[in-house]
């Protein structure tokens, strides 16, 4: 933040931080008794425990958490995060499904999402919270067709008896979560979701970072993203503009202790749907 403190803004399900109980909003004070540096504090320590001092409330004494960094492939990490995020939130009025799509950089992500809806924990939900906050982009506009109720879904069975679904469609209420970490192809999905009134868009305006880019290593441990293609969506420019939600919900994640007012609002809206 503007005071030089480091806060956790997202915890990917199934990753080492999630496994040891790190929460959104935690301030990371130190690592192995040294001031915390993102990436640098974990460099060369894969598989070895690192002692993190975490402050969970403003002015509170830090607590110590031991975490072992892992060598993770991003697409595998995001795929596992997607699957492990899927759950049912039970309310007095409805069973609300929840899933967090951290990245669409692999086609396997969309297939896994469809499987969660047809054969996984989301299949019996009355409504769905589709969380696109944080992570990477990579989404294609046609992924929105998953929420097009006017197209058919096919169920096919092979000679071996195995059954699968083709062109899966979600025909129940859905809300999308967005924030300033929603970028690139996810912003295209957010635009279409809002423009075609597929459901409520809840949270904060997206980043406005839509241009296609190529990454270059700079030689000093840096990474330069250089725009290589202009992008218009339905003739409109989202770059530098972003997509605004239909329901604005502020979220100051500092010392949130895992609380999530944007998700809480989405559940409230869908429970009334």
Where are these regions (language model features)?
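PDZ/PDZ-like domain segments forming the peptide/carboxylate-binding groove
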Residues: 1-37, 229
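Hydrophobic residues embedded in beta-strands of well-ordered beta-sheets
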Residues: 6, 95-97, 224
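Cleft-lining beta-strand/loop regions that shape enzyme active-site pockets
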Residues: 10, 35, 40-219, 255, ...
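Generic structural signal for buried aliphatic residues
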Residues: 28-29, 50, 238
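Short conserved micro-motifs at the rims of enzyme active sites and ligand-binding pockets
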Residues: 110, 187-188, 236-242, 259
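C-terminal structured "cap/appendage" subdomains that terminate the fold
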Residues: 215-240, 245-246
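Low-complexity, Gly/Ser/Thr/Pro-rich intrinsically disordered linker/tail segments
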Residues: 253-273
